[in-house]
Amino acid sequence: MTAPGILWLTRDFRLRDNPALLAAIADGPLLTVFFIDRLTMAQGAASRWRLERALRIFDAALRVRTGGKGIVVLRGEAHEILPALMKRLSVRQLHQSDWPTVEMQALQDRMRAALRPLGAGLILHPGHLLVHPGAVRSGNGGAYRVYSPFARAVRQRGPDRPAADAPPGIEPCTEPLGGLDLSTLDLAPDLHRGRAALERFAAPAGEEAALAGLDDFLDRACAYPRERDRPDLDATSRLSDHLAVGEISPRTIWARAMLRAEISPEHAAGIDKFLSEVLWREFSWHLLIGFPEMPVACWRSEWEGFPWQKDGASLIRWQRAETGVALVDAGLREMWLTGQMHNRVRMVVASWLTKHLLIDWRAGLAHFADCLTDWDPASNAMNWQWVAGCGPDAAPYFRIFNPERQAEQYDPRGDYRRRWLAGFDRAAGPEAVAWIESTPRDWHTGPWRAGPSAMLAEGRKAALAALAHFRANTSET
């Protein structure tokens, strides 16, 4: 038997522009292996549910290209299982799409150690970024810490390589290897009552859905600069969960967007603004690679001494979307039901927790990690630190979002709040009712009620006082 090419599948569930997949195919008949391991199960429940959808759809796509051979799904630790399999099949190199988090790098190190006695190696392929970390440097030769010059440098340089086409046909490995039945797989048993809501309201998954969504967005990109901050409108690309699991690559997005801007100049300004948001994602990953502790430690280390409040009751009310602040609660309920939250609303929700309630940003990040289908460790850590004021290129400490003013400006008719809040100002819609049906039974799920109006001003006043006192007693500048 010809030795196969093995793809260790952890991310990048796509055929197009998938360097790891193409490299494995070049080695020999394709064997794609996915492991249900400790790292997979450590992800948030909604993220695991979304990963399972990506896995099923990619398996079906591979079966079409291979004549019926899909993904071999195994339960256990990859570094304990793959070396013996590679030895039996006479395979000397293993291919994986890189995902440079601390946890994944530790797993990759264990895999390298397990393969070393066999004379085999692990080859990592860039699949989730436009440019390789370190390819763009600031004037002093170091990594960029501010977004604007980073974005200019990446735009001037362009992606590392063109987006590759999907392989037209794939020769599969025919060695019988068993594996779990994907049709009965359940990676998120802890979703409980929330599963039905995600299945009903979450966006379509899969590579084809991602490409269709991108093309649909580019058709209306001219309105993006004007409407992107409006949660009551369908004005964004909704590609974040596709990017999170790798159903579409940023290189594909970049190439299609640039081509559309050239063909349709009337959309060029909107596409340019959209690509600036793609570059924010890129920036966050370059920051994470340079500062791997970003999801758990303040970028500005002096902020570790900030006196965050240990207010368990307020945190629980925030997690349960019962703060009494309409825009905040609407956003948290949108996240619970759909696995996503509009970006403008995310900033308001995060500001309420970290500024009005003075609760540690890491508590908010943990809740988002459990509830988001588009969970991205780099983007979410950077954005939480940006709002809290402790991150690179962060918002100034006195930047405290006023939820009522934000709602007046960006949800002027109340359509967004009305959609998610039963009792906001009229009969509940299907989404608001679904919130009651999908949350744990011991939560308070009566009609939504606004909190006292004075709490906005009082919270802002207390936050400014605490932040000013902190700055006066630290080296924060």
List each model region and its residues.
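Glycine/tryptophan-enriched, flexible segments
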Residues: 141-298, 410-411, 415-477
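Generic alpha-helical segment signature
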Residues: 51, 207, 321-324, 456
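Intrinsically disordered, low-complexity boundary segments flanking structured domains
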Residues: 20-23, 55-59, 110, 131-136, ...
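Long, low-complexity intrinsically disordered regions
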Residues: 104-107, 118, 193-196, 299, ...
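Short charge-dense sequence patches
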Residues: 1-14, 30-38, 63, 200-209, ...
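Trp/Phe/Arg-rich N-terminal binding region typifying the photolyase-homology
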Residues: 1-166, 270, 333, 379, ...
